[in-house]
């Protein structure tokens, strides 16, 4: 427990130091920064804001977790698998950001390229996970379900789905970073209950990194995490839920990401079926609230108000999960 707290403190301090240096490098190198293509007027002023800040908290968290795990003899297969997903999905996000920022390719990696790289990471994760006796059992609440060979498809769906879901959530200042902190706190409780102090190290380490990042990412954001951060964080949450054998919990602990992704799917489907009509003003759904409150046609919500609304949903989902598990 103490080792995990040390990892969190180390990562927090390194991120607090690293982010300003990263921002200075960005400005000194005259890098263009974040481009804004959204129809939300409030966001146009953010054009040029440094991005790829996830590189900092990702590197500090992975290094701190690896070194502290190694010296505390907690560098288990479970910890290594989560670090692997963080690194690999972080690399996918880094390539995507690099193409957008440095090569001026607005799309970054195309969907097929991104999916292929995420699939490769997911397949490697599954086979490593399976080789160490994890089995093919999916726990739904307290009911074990044997999936057999289908479990590999579930793992791929879980990793890729939540990786992209957190990416969709990262649309306004501070929203994704604190939403993930809330999710990680819930998984920290589960890890402690299971006495998985190895996994607790990377959980607390990332919490420290995200809190350090939030100092510069809250409104008005001085830096964005970019795909390098959001894709890695989503993959990490999925990997943690799998490693703790509590996969179903991510549907509630990650209810914010589920809500955001579902809103996009509903919008696209309805738009195609009705020949151009919309359910929401704009998706992901946090933009709907920005533009017109709960109904989408009322008074605009500030980014802080949207943040607190979604963080509240995340807290409720996490508390409900813990209540189901332990009460």
Curated annotation (Swiss-Prot):
It is found in: Cell membrane. Its main location: membrane. One of its GO terms (cellular component) is plasma membrane. Its EC number is 2.7.8.13. InterPro entries: Glycosyl_transferase_4, PNAcMuramoyl-5peptid_Trfase, PNAcMuramoyl-5peptid_Trfase_CS. It is a multi-pass membrane protein. GO terms for biological process: cell division; cell wall organization; peptidoglycan biosynthetic process; regulation of cell shape. PROSITE patterns: MRAY_2. GO terms for molecular function: metal ion binding; phospho-N-acetylmuramoyl-pentapeptide-transferase activity. Keywords: Cell cycle, Cell division, Cell membrane, Cell shape, Cell wall biogenesis/degradation, Magnesium, Membrane, Metal-binding, Peptidoglycan synthesis, Transferase, Transmembrane, Transmembrane helix. It comes from the Bacteria. Belongs to the glycosyltransferase 4 family. MraY subfamily. NCBIfam families: mraY (TIGR00445). This is Phospho-N-acetylmuramoyl-pentapeptide-transferase.
């Amino acid at each position: 427990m103490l080792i995990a707290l040390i990892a969190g403190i180390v990562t927090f301090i390194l991120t607090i130091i690293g982010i300003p240096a990263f921002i200075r490098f960005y400005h000194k190198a005259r890098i263009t920064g974040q481009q804004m293509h959204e129809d939300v007027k409030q966001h146009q002023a953010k054009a040029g804001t440094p991005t790829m800040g996830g590189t900092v908290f990702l590197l500090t968290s992975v290094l701190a977790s690896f070194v502290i795990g190694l010296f505390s003899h907690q560098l288990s297969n479970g910890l290594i698998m989560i670090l692997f997903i963080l690194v690999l999905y972080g690399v996918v996000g880094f390539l995507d950001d690099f193409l957008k920022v440095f090569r001026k390719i607005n799309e970054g990696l195309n969907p097929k390229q991104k999916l292929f790289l995420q699939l490769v990471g997911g397949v490697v994760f599954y086979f490593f996970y399976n080789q160490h006796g994890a089995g093919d059992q999916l726990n739904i609440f307290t009911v074990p379900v044997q999936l057999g060979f289908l479990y590999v498809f579930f793992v791929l769906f879980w990793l890729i789905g939540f990786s992209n879901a957190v990416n969709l959530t990262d649309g306004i200042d501070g929203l994704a970073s604190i939403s993930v902190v809330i999710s990680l706190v819930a998984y920290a409780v589960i890890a402690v209950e299971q006495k998985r102090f190895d996994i607790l190290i990377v959980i607390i380490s990332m919490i420290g990194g995200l809190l350090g990042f939030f100092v510069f990412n809250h409104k008005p954001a001085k830096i964005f995490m970019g795909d390098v951060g959001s894709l890695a964080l989503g993959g990490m949450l999925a990997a943690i839920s799998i490693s703790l054998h509590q996969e179903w919990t991510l549907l509630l602990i990650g209810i914010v990401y589920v809500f955001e992704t579902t809103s996009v799917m509903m919008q696209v489907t309805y738009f195609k079926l009705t020949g151009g009509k919309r359910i929401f003003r704009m998706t992901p759904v946090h933009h709907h609230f920005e533009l017109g409150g709960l109904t989408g046609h009322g008074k605009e919500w500030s980014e802080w108000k949207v943040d607190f609304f979604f963080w509240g949903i995340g807290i409720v989902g996490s508390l409900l999960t813990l209540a189901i598990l332990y009460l």
